[in-house]
Curated annotation (Swiss-Prot):
Keywords linked to the UniProt accession: Cytoplasm, Elongation factor, Protein biosynthesis
A GO term, aspect molecular function: translation elongation factor activity
Pfam families given in the database record: EF_TS
Domain of life: Bacteria
Family affiliation: Belongs to the EF-Ts family.
Spans annotated as Involved in Mg(2+) ion dislocation from EF-Tu: 80-83
Protein's job: Associates with the EF-Tu.GDP complex and induces the exchange of GDP to GTP. It remains bound to the aminoacyl-tRNA.EF-Tu.GTP complex up to the GTP hydrolysis stage on the ribosome.
Major location category of this protein: cytoplasm
PANTHER family assigned to the protein according to its UniProt record, in alphabetical order: ELONGATION FACTOR TS, ELONGATION FACTOR TS, MITOCHONDRIAL
Name assigned to this protein: Elongation factor Ts
Originating species: Aliivibrio salmonicida (strain LFI1238)
């Protein structure tokens, strides 16, 4: 049996970022062959990552990276808020975002493939499912970004002074508009909401003809509420975002808002009794 020296363990740790005992075990099993140890650790890591893949990863971080005229927003997920603050996890997320920006990668599948080995290594080290979930590139004459903690990120593309666009980005973070202008709301979305509002009015005892007329005002309110320029501006609620943009000589052509875990169905939290039962089952 080959001797596993401290120097070999140190080198393997530096190359894999794995723990000391894991490195020593891998070297013993590989009879001191460091390349074989690395290969075996990668295979073991892939197997562990595959087992973790079914775990719900709804925590994580939003990263924003910018350079002249281009910005990237990235969502990387993990299972717990504790890991979301881990330096290794955040370092990985930042590296992915930097590459996405440098290579203008807007294809999530290609980005995932590029970082799969690094992801597997991180899953092995941290012990949680890690997912590169979403990436969005935004281009524009003028860009403004806003990050609310680690969980929400917004990038605005448009024209105007930096302060105005920054305030609009903050508004988007808080108010969650779905479209830029009321006219951008798709016809099928409008028709679906209109049908709901007509039914509500008729259930209130209104004849269909009157209900149809009542709904006109409600639909204007609806398209305003779901669009950026139609919303009341959070910093001056008596004015709409459109009013503010007009006053400042600014405009918004596009925006992207990402929030960690949105759309992911989280598992229901276990009660204390359920936790005890689970422990007893082993």
């Amino acid at each position: 049996m080959a001797t596993v020296t401290a120097a070999l363990v140190k080198e393997l740790r530096e190359r894999t970022a794995a723990g000391m005992m894991e490195c020593k075990k891998a070297l013993v099993e590989a009879e001191g062959d460091i390349e074989l140890a690395i290969e075996n650790m990668r295979k073991s890591g892939a197997a562990k990552a595959a087992k973790k893949a079914g775990n719900i990863a709804a925590e994580g971080t939003i990263i924003i990276k910018e350079e002249a005229g281009v910005a990237v927003l990235l969502e990387v997920n993990c299972q717990t808020d504790f890991v979301a603050k881990d330096s290794g996890f955040l370092g990985f997320a930042n590296e992915v975002a930097e590459v996405a920006l440098a290579e203008r990668l807007n294809d999530i599948v290609a980005l995932q493939a590029k970082f799969e080995d690094a992801r597997i290594a991180l899953v092995t080290k941290i012990g949680e499912n890690i997912s590169i979930r979403r990436v969005q590139l935004v281009e524009g004459v003028a860009l403004a970004s806003y990050r609310h903690g680690e969980k929400i990120g917004v990038v605005i593309a448009g024209e105007g002074d930096a302060e105005t666009l920054k305030h609009i980005a903050m508004h988007v973070a808080a108010s969650k508009p779905e479209y830029v202008n009321p006219s951008d709301v798709p016809a099928d979305v409008v028709e679906k909401e209109k049908a709901v509002q007509v039914e509500i009015a008729m259930n209130e005892g209104k004849p269909q003809e009157i209900a149809e007329k009542m709904v006109i005002g409600r639909m204007k309110k609806f398209t305003g509420e779901v669009s950026l320029t139609g919303q009341a501006f959070i910093m001056e609620p008596k004015k709409t975002v459109a009013d503010i943009l007009k006053e400042k000589g600014a405009s918004v052509s596009n925006f992207v808002r990402l929030e960690v875990g949105e759309g992911i169905e989280k598992a229901a939290e276990m009660s204390f009794a359920d936790e005890v039962a689970a422990v007893q089952k082993g």
